[in-house]
Amino acid sequence: MKPLIALVGRPNVGKSTLFNRILRQKSAIVDPTPGVTRDRHINPGEWQGKQFLLMDTGGYAPENDSLSVAMLDQTMRAIADADAIIFMVDARSGLTYLDLDIAKILKQTFSDKKIFFAINKVDNPQLALEAAAMVRSGFTEPYLISARDGGGVADMLDDILETLPCPESEDEELDDDSIKLAVLGRPNVGKSSLVNALLGTDRQIVSDVPGTTRDAIDSVLKRNGKEYILIDTAGLRKRTKIDPGIEYYSSLRTERAIERCQVALVLLDAQLGLESQDMKIIHMAIERKKGVLILVNKWDLVEKDSKTSKKFTDNLMMQLGNIGYIPIIFTSALTKKNCYRAIDTAAQIAINRRQKISTSNLNRFLQEALAMRHPASKSGKELKIKYMTQIEAGHPVFAFFCNDPQLLENNFKRFLEKRLRESFDFEGLPITMRFLRK
C-alpha cells in the first residue's frame, strides 16, 4: 500500500500551496482566507520513483485561536491513518498558541508516527534567521521551506520518503490476485446491506440513519474460484452537510478506497436517481483510471411496468453524457436481486482493465477504423496515423503515432474511442489515448 503523508497545521500556513507544489499540479484551491475548504483532500504523488498519497487536512478553521473540539475531530481523525506527518507553521507570523497546541497534541497522540516540522514562507535570509528561533515547538531540526517557490521542499521529501516503506509493486492493486471492489455511494443507499447480502451475514451495523458505517472496512468474498476484496465505505456527503469530524474523516477514507480498488461499484438510490454527489464519486474514480459499475439499488421499492427500467436507463445515460460507457445494473440488497450478477460484471471489468492487446491486432483494428472514417483535414493538412500500440500501465492506455497531433479533431478521437470499446470490450473503463508525433 502506498504510504500516506498528511499535511497538518493551523489555517493559512500554506498547506494547500505545499500540496500543489509536491503534486506539481493545481489540485487544491489556494485562498488567503483561513479555512477555505477544498474539494479534493487526498491525491497520489511520486517523487524520485517513489509513490505515495498526500493528504491536506486543511479546510476547517476554529472560531478562535484555541484548538477546539471541532479542530481535533477534523484534523486529528483525518491523520489517524497517516504514515508520516508534515507539521507546518508560518515563519512570517511566528509560533502562535494554536501552533503550540497542535504540536503538543501531535506529540501526545501521535508519538508513534514520523513527524517532520516544516517552517514555511521562508522566502528571504532574514526570515531564515527568524525561523531558526522557532524550534521551541519541541521538534528538532526544522525544515526551512518556501512552498510558493519550492525552496527546501525537495530535501524534505527526500528525508520523508527515505523513512517510509515503498510499495512492493508500482500498483498497490497488484499486491495479490484478488479483485478489489470499492462499494461507494451517498449515505443510506444500501452499501452495507449489499455487502451483507453478498456475504450472507450481518457483518456490519445496518441502520436507516445515514452514515452508520464510518470507516472503510474490507471483507473477503469467494465466488466461482475468484477472491474479491469488498471495500465498504461511508458515503460521500455534499461538503455543506459534512459534520465536523467523523463525516469529514469518512470522506477521506472513501477517496483512499478508490485509490485501492480496481473497480468502483457506485450505488444509486432508485427512488432518487443520479445526483450531483453521485457524479462526483464517478468522476473521482474515472480520474484515477478505475473501472466503474453503476448499481441502481432499492429497485424493489420502485413501482414499475415493462418500460420502467428502459426509461430509467435512457435518462441515466443522458445524464452521464460522454461517460455513457458505464454499465448499469438494477439491484436490491434486500431481495438479493442481481447482487451476484453485479459481482460477475465487476470481475469482467477488472479482467478487461488489464487485458494486453497485441500490436498486430491493434493495427488491424486501426486500418479497419480508418477505412470506415477518414480524419478530416485541418488548415489544408491531413492527419495521418501511421500505427498504434498499447502502453503497459495497468489500465487501457494507447499511443497513436501520427504526422501532427495538432491536426486531431475531437470528433475523430471520440470515434476511435468508441470503436476501441466495441472491438475489445472496454465497457465501464476509461481509456487514455495519446497521439504522438512520428
UniProtKB/Swiss-Prot annotation:
Pfam families: KH_dom-like, MMR_HSR1
Cited HAMAP family: GTPase_Der (MF_00195)
Annotated ranges, domain KH-like: 355-438
Record's function text: GTPase that plays an essential role in the late steps of ribosome biogenesis.
Oligomeric and partner information: Associates with the 50S ribosomal subunit.
Protein origin, superkingdom: Bacteria
Family of this protein: Belongs to the TRAFAC class TrmE-Era-EngA-EngB-Septin-like GTPase superfamily. EngA (Der) GTPase family.
Keywords recorded for this protein, A-Z: GTP-binding, Nucleotide-binding, Repeat, Ribosome biogenesis
Protein's GO biological process: ribosome biogenesis
Residues annotated as binding GTP 1: 9-16, 56-60, 120-123
InterPro entries: G_ENGA, GTP-bd, GTPase_Der, KH_dom-like, KH_dom-like_a/b, P-loop_NTPase, Small_GTP-bd
UniProt-recorded Gene Ontology molecular function terms: GTP binding
PROSITE patterns named among the record's database cross-references: G_ENGA
UniProt name for this protein: GTPase Der
